[in-house]
């Protein structure tokens, strides 16, 4: 009988390594530990969010900070998107760190519901740091990164994005992590708003749909 199963993940040319629990008889699963390979060996990163977003470029379209929760640990990550006209008959779509099929679905939603004409665009997506995330709550960050690159409008660096438009779990932890790292604005699903509306020190923008979220983040229009 196996008590615990751990996966050791990491890209070959990346200094960060992940230890992910997928089975644990004595605690929760899907917990994540982040380590860095140094001259003394693997060293735990006590605040991985700060390190993983520290090199985020300023005023660059297609880059957005997203909030995710792995197990019970909230983390902020940088989502990067590049959208450019295709040179081929069929547009190329590449996703690193996120589920490829889910990205395809979100692109279809952007075309149908938001009206972005990306059917003839190559789309490249990447989560910085070599981390793979399957949580549905990053969907909103994905579509905003794509829209930002497509419109060539940079996302305000003081804004973080948490959750899909439906309510997400651990909303208090996500907002606390954003506040800890100095973010002053955050976009969340409206269904989560009542729980956190009295939070001090950060401006909370609730959204009902993708179009509204994109207009707020890229255009500053809260209506």
Language-model features, listed with the residues they occupy:
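Peripheral, non-AAA+ core regions of ATP-driven protein-machinery
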Residues: 1-66, 73-223
């Amino acid at each position: 009988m196996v008590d615990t199963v751990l996966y050791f993940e990491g890209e070959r040319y990346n200094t960060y390594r992940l230890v992910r629990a997928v089975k644990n008889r004595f605690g929760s699963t899907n917990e994540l530990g982040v380590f860095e390979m140094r001259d003394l060996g693997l060293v735990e990163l006590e605040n991985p969010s700060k390190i993983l977003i520290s090199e985020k470029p300023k005023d660059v379209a297609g880059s957005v900070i997203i909030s995710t929760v792995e197990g019970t640990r909230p983390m902020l990550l940088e989502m990067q998107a590049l959208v450019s006209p295709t040179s081929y008959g069929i547009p190329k779509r590449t996703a690193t760190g996120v589920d490829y099929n889910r990205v395809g679905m979100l692109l279809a939603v952007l075309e149908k519901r938001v009206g972005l004409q990306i059917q003839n665009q190559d789309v490249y997506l990447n989560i910085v740091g070599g981390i793979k995330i399957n949580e549905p709550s990053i969907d909103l960050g994905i579509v905003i990164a794509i829209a930002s690159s497509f419109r060539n409008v940079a996302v305000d660096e003081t804004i973080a994005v948490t959750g899909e438009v439906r309510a997400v779990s651990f909303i208090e932890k996500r907002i606390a992590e954003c506040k800890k790292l100095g973010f002053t604005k955050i976009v969340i699903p409206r269904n989560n708003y009542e729980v956190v509306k009295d939070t001090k020190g950060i401006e909370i923008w609730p959204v009902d749909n993708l179009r509204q979220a994109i207009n707020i983040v890229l255009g500053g229009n809260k209506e």
